[in-house]
Amino acid sequence: MKMSMFMEKSLAAMLAAGMTVSLIGCGGQTTESVQTEKAQQTTTAQGTSAGSETGGGEVTLEFQQWWGVELPDGVLKEICDGFTEQSGVKIELLSNPYADTKTQIAAGAAAGTMADVVGLDGSWVYDFAKQGSITNMTELMSADGYDDGQLSDQIKVDGNTYMIPVVNFAYPMYVNKTLLESAGISEVPKTWGEFTEACKKVSAANKGVAGWAIPLSTESPSGIQNNFMSWLWASGGTMLKDGKPALTDNPLMSDTVDFVKGLFDAGVVAPGAYSMKEADMVEEFTNGRVAFMTDSLAHLTTIKKEAPDLKFEFMPVPVKEGYTGKSGMDVANWGIGIAENCEQKAEAMKFVEYLMSPEVNARLAVYANAFPGNVNAKPDYSKADELFVKAYELYQQCYAINEFTGLPTSEELMRQFDEQLQLYIDGDTASTADMLSATQEIWQGAFQ
């Protein structure tokens, strides 16, 4: 995928109005104390012109991202050094924690001093593209004759690519095997109906245990993306049509709302959902108080470390009865883009192509505990956790999707949907149709 994880209220908000961050599992908010040796040069570097060329004709590209602090020490530098050996182009790493990186990139975007190559969160792309801060990568790929068919995804604005996901962090469904066994359930549920019944049995057999958890805190509304829409996407559904909101006249969306409300009505959802954040949900699952949750694969290591005796596995998100097509799996990613103010765009594009090459991309995916952004990459997960391998197999059976990526004010869209969903669950909105109609009207304002 890690989709959180991904805030200082600050310079970024003032200089890049309208930008919001969708907090998903791979956002990397946790390693804020670690920095690479180049991290402290960030502020100074942003005040200089990007894409510098030395007197001897050597090209140096600045690469600003948060990946370096989340990868094992030295890995990103080693990978970038490989590009230098191959091309002669030097890469200056500007690595900081996720929140700091977002602030610095936003400041650089407003001032026209953005680093040549930047790590991107999908929720930033629309605003940066509309600002003219990041460049049209479709044109660069075309000029290079680059085969974009090898890319697992491309984040587009107005039909043009502005971000390429380098590695993907998947959101499979976690299931507590012990709780299922206690309720006499021998097989994981495959459909919505089976899932509802499983949740009821688990709750009935275990006092103080919930069947399912969904974090619906409006302070961090990514539960709409990762825990609600994952039901829709798994059954082949969509919330958009031609890049615009399509919440009404959408039978599967309506059915998804009714299904989730039905889980609340049945009393099988973990209490405190309206104030729950993703970290709270993970804690509930880790402590054995929830049977099912959809969550980032990025939390696998943490859960196993904090609850070594917990028996759990991954499963596909159940689908609506009768659906036999391929399922969509929610993903988050480390994206990459090129600054419009970069003076060496051709070299910058070559660097992106290098990171997306099958061999390099596979290596990066392994170190990041993620899945590759190049469909031809073959990561060697032979030494990986067995559960990680199982998740990768599930991922390969699905198609990656996250329709919030690249949308204008994506986090605010989640919050608005969240608020309307809560009103419907509580009975303050009369019907599913009314709830979706109200949300559709609110959402359309962001697409004017």
Residue ranges and their predicted role:
Residues 57-68, 89-94, 116-117, 162, ...:
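Short, well-ordered beta-strand elements
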Residues 78, 82-149, 156, 178-190, ...:
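Extracytoplasmic "Venus flytrap"/periplasmic binding protein-like
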Residues 90, 181, 265, 379, ...:
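Conserved C-terminal helix/tail region of periplasmic/extracytoplasmic solute-binding proteins
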Residues 1-62, 85, 139, 143, ...:
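Short, low-complexity disordered leader/linker segments with a strong preference
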Residues 59, 81-82, 86, 90, ...:
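Extracytoplasmic/periplasmic substrate-recognition and gating elements
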Residues 198-201, 244-273:
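Glycine-centered hinge/linker elements that transmit conformational signals in sensory
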Residues 135-149, 211-222, 235-255, 305-306, ...:
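Short, solvent-exposed loop/beta-turn-alpha elements that line the ligand-binding surface or hinge
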Residues 48, 52-57, 121-172, 181, ...:
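Hinge/lid segment of periplasmic solute-binding proteins
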